[in-house]
């Protein structure tokens, strides 16, 4: 019996009938007996049958190959090479869904227009940047978290209490995978509430500080007005207060001055020498009957009822003279003073 399997190859099988009318023949087994299992493997690759049938046949063939290899002493099993998947390494750049803007940024020009060679990317001048056109579909939108809407918090204390309560409830109700998201949303709500509270508190001291500044300015103005209205003391009075005459040390102890009768300024001119005679320290003897108005701070007076009176003056001392009195006359003779 001969069968034609196309023009390329002819397979010949000899099957004895032995006087039988109905004979059942397994063509695959007969081919395996003559050509071996390799012929059947090639036929399976070209076969378009179901995957279930192919898996069942492959297991049967593997068992036959192991049996034939053990009988012949040679192993014909070969390991299949793993195919390389190019889809993992490359992608379709024309696909608008893929956002590949970062790749274009890396391909920026490495030189300027002044005769340099550009390795890759567009030609760009110094200081300029590459403008990449992005499709509208690839724009990323920020997702608004529902935590701010579900947990409004006007005050800080209320937010902390609600956050603790919700966190305790989430441990019992939610699963372990959803707990981190829950805690993050609570923390964000607490942070937003703290920021709002700080802004409100910052507004109050500003208003208070402005009012305080106004009050201080008004007080300063009032003090300036009052100080300008008070009359200043004359310099003459200050100098009179500052001037103090020092009394030199003497051998005799000081005696408190006796009460003397007041005399008119005319008596002073009769018994006092001109100012030129009193510049140097000197002692002058006066009669007991004469009396002078002497300042207690400028001189020390030693008086006795029956003896003469000695007056000790310092170098810069001056006798008190009435301001309304006229200057002493220079024509007074010195012989009048003993």
UniProtKB/Swiss-Prot annotation:
Protein family membership: Belongs to the HPC2 family.
Source lineage: Eukaryota, Fungi, Dikarya, Ascomycota, Taphrinomycotina
Protein localization: Nucleus
Record-linked Pfam families: HUN (PF08729)
UniProtKB keywords: Chromatin regulator, Nucleus, Phosphoprotein, Transcription, Transcription regulation
Complexes and interactors: Component of the HIR complex.
Primary location: nucleus
Biological process (GO), any one: chromatin organization
Protein name: Histone promoter control protein 2
Alphabetized InterPro entries for the sequence: HRD (IPR014840)
UniProt feature, compositional bias: Polar residues: 276-301
């Amino acid at each position: 019996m001969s069968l034609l399997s196309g023009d390329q190859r002819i397979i010949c099988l000899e099957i004895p009938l032995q006087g039988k009318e109905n004979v059942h023949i397994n063509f695959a087994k007969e081919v395996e007996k003559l050509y071996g299992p390799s012929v059947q493997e090639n036929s399976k690759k070209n076969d378009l049958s179901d995957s279930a049938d192919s898996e069942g046949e492959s297991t049967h063939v593997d068992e036959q190959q192991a049996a034939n290899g053990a009988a012949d002493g040679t192993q014909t099993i070969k390991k299949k090479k793993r195919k390389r998947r190019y889809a993992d390494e490359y992608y379709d750049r024309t696909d608008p869904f893929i956002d590949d803007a970062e790749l274009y940024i890396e391909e920026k020009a490495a030189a300027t227009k002044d005769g340099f060679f550009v390795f890759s990317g567009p030609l760009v001048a110094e200081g300029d940047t590459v403008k990449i056109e992005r499709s509208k579909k690839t724009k990323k939108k920020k997702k608004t978290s529902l935590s701010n809407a579900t947990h409004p918090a006007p005050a800080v204390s209320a937010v902390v209490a609600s956050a603790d309560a919700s966190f305790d409830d989430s441990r019992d109700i939610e699963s372990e995978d959803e707990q981190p998201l829950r805690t993050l949303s609570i923390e964000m709500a607490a942070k937003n509430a703290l920021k709002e509270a700080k802004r409100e508190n910052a507004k109050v001291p500003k208003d208070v500080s402005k009012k305080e500044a106004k009050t201080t300015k008004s007080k300063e103005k009032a003090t300036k007005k009052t100080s300008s209205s008070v009359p200043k003391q004359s310099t003459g009075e200050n100098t009179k207060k500052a001037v103090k005459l020092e009394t030199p040390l003497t051998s005799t102890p000081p005696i408190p001055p006796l009460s003397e009768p007041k005399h008119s300024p005319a008596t002073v001119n009769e018994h006092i020498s001109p100012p030129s005679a009193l510049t140097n320290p000197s002692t002058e003897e006066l009669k007991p009957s004469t009396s002078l108005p002497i300042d207690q701070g400028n001189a020390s007076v030693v008086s006795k009822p029956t003896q003469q009176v000695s007056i000790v003056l310092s170098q810069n001392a001056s006798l008190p003279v009435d301001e309304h009195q006229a200057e002493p006359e220079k024509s007074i003779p010195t012989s009048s003073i003993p």
